[in-house]
Each structure stands twice: as structure tokens, then as C-alpha cells.
Amino acid sequence: MSIDPKLWGNAFWSTLHHVAAGYNDHPSLGARQVMTNFIQSIPVLLPCAECQDHAFDYIGRADLDRVVSSRRQLFLFFFNFHNHVNARLNKPQLAAKTVFQRYRVPFDGEAAAATTEPPFHWSPWLTTALAVILVVVVAGIGHRSRFK
């Protein structure tokens, strides 16, 4: 069953950007492993088969060890992932400075333009909590759409 991304897409991207903004600048090995698992689970969480395929492809090409090495790297990964999807859908590209400011992540124009890296303290339980919330939201949308 596929659910129209217009119903869940904005909340999904907002969640990913918030997760990255809350990630530690210098994450522990455990936090990096949890985040790697979270990123790899993203395609499975998506309620759209086409979106799942595209996410598997995009994530499969990423150097996840580098992506999870810092807040900046993780934030840039999700920022670039979001813009990659927007380009595929012929939607406007997000401006790096705007997105970084919105999520209160320090902005370095050079590094952001080069593509890849990014304030509250990250803890492993947050990934689990956000993943559960995302699954509940997606399941709720699917449940409601069946009864319309």
C-alpha cells in the first residue's frame, strides 16, 4: 500500500532535519551505530513503494561512516537528500543558509556549498523515540485513509 507523500512528506523531512540538528558534534561509537541503523531503516519506514526504492538507492551510495561522524555531516546528508528528492520531483531546491538557520545549526557557507556535514545534546533513545513516532504517524495516516 502506498500513501501519497503529500500527506506525510513535510513531517518526515522536518523529523529528519530535527534529528540531525539534535545529533552530537562528537558522537560516541554507540550513537554513530544507532544513527547508522536509523538511516538504513528510513526506506522501510516510507509508506510509498517508489519513495522506498529511491531512498534505498540514495542511502546505498552514501558513506554512512562519514555521515554519522558529526552533527554537521548528518545535517548536510539530510539536507542534500531532501534537495535530491526535490530535484527529482522538479521542486525548488532548499537554500542551505535558510535550512541551517531554521534548525539552529551553525552555518558555514563553504562547507555547505561543498556538500556533506552539523545544537542540543544527542542521546540514543531519541532516535528510537522519533522512529516510533514516525511509524505511529505513518500507520495512523494509513489507517485513516482506509476508512474514508
From Swiss-Prot:
Catalytic activity: 2 R'C(R)SH + O2 = R'C(R)S-S(R)CR' + H2O2
E.C. numbers: 1.8.3.2
Chief location category: membrane
Keyword vocabulary terms for this entry: Disulfide bond, FAD, Flavoprotein, Membrane, Oxidoreductase, Transmembrane, Transmembrane helix
Membrane topology: Single-pass membrane protein
Location relative to the cell: Membrane
Start and end residues of each ERV/ALR sulfhydryl oxidase domain: 1-103
PANTHER family given in the database record: ALR/ERV (PTHR12645), FAD-LINKED SULFHYDRYL OXIDASE ALR (PTHR12645:SF0)
Family to which the UniProt record says this protein belongs: Belongs to the IIV-6 347L family.
Function summary: FAD-dependent sulfhydryl oxidase that catalyzes disulfide bond formation.
Protein name: Putative FAD-linked sulfhydryl oxidase 096R
Native source species: Invertebrate iridescent virus 3 (IIV-3)
